């Protein structure tokens, strides 16, 4: 009996100590947060509110308002900060102290990033070299013609659906459009927008996005570390599907590359990393850079275009404004090209407004190299920080009438709005301008050829589904050919 009492005492002591550790402030300006329970921390609140259909982005939106835009949260034994205070975010934009990704990554991210490689999850010199390589390739390689050709192929592939009065399900077709364009740029390989490979890759990326956004015990407790690879190999199968494709392309390029005539991004990376002197780690880095590009180039573009089409259907009066602008810009041309973009600012504004209200979530984590005071808040060294872009986008002090869907807010230069659609500061997406062009071509050509209608005349459900990028529920629409 005495042993049991001692055992119970030790358990209680541990729980009290853990509770104090999780809730005690280490600095007078330490951010506050909801009560963190022993062992599980704030996972308790997440799971509790899930019972009432409250998703993570909604829960942390409420916490953001309560705790002045910087929320402390414990997930098991891991400490996070969710930041929507824009004055604090400005420090992340400008200060090199916040340019790195966490060295102790959440295990799911660790697995998806090959333990902190690539252009999205690496830090310091590794990241700077990867970013420079990708940026240089984007500058050298002219993607204008490629994007315009793929946009035409995308639109032409919808002819059969329209002629047969079939329901158009945008997501799969957008995945094909994004994948086929990326394959040509990255591997110099032609891939039809309707190919099975495009759908396979698109589904794999969606699978990774969805599962990375869901907390598991393996993400929260170091004790499970021996089982990480076993668990995430099964949970993140989409990673391995994409990695196998990239690895095969890497091997084929090594056999056929002509250093004097690089064909694509893979050639550019192989040359940058030394070609015949490439180490195993270099190969992993090259492959991870390509993997990282698949995420935003396929996943984020698909999610955003899917949202844009939904908003155009639900707002026919705004769809008509966008169509008239496109029609006027193209004049007698059969398709929209990038030369028309300067005369079609409304559709670009429509895309940005959709991203602001719908698809921007928490982004990727960053960390603090050293302790730092950011305005009214103390951010400790090695903190894992997520920027809550959705909450920033709904802040009335930053965006006037923030809850209102109003693309024209991006057309008034006298009222500047933050450009947070692709991240902030040095860690913003290096391919953001290409992504906007790709979406502009796809959406504007779709509008030029078809009037987009809901199936039954009622609005499509626009409730947000939590993911790495916030996504819409799957839906179908009618395509009415314009005369």
Curated annotation (Swiss-Prot):
GO terms for cellular component: membrane. It comes from the Eukaryota. Keywords: Heme, Iron, Membrane, Metal-binding, Monooxygenase, Oxidoreductase, Transmembrane, Transmembrane helix. It comes from Dictyostelium discoideum (Social amoeba). It is a single-pass membrane protein. The keyword Secreted does not apply. This is Probable cytochrome P450 517A1. Its EC number is 1.14.-.-. InterPro entries: Cyt_P450, Cyt_P450_CS, Cyt_P450_E_grp-I, Cyt_P450_sf. It is found in: Membrane. The keyword Oxidoreductase applies.
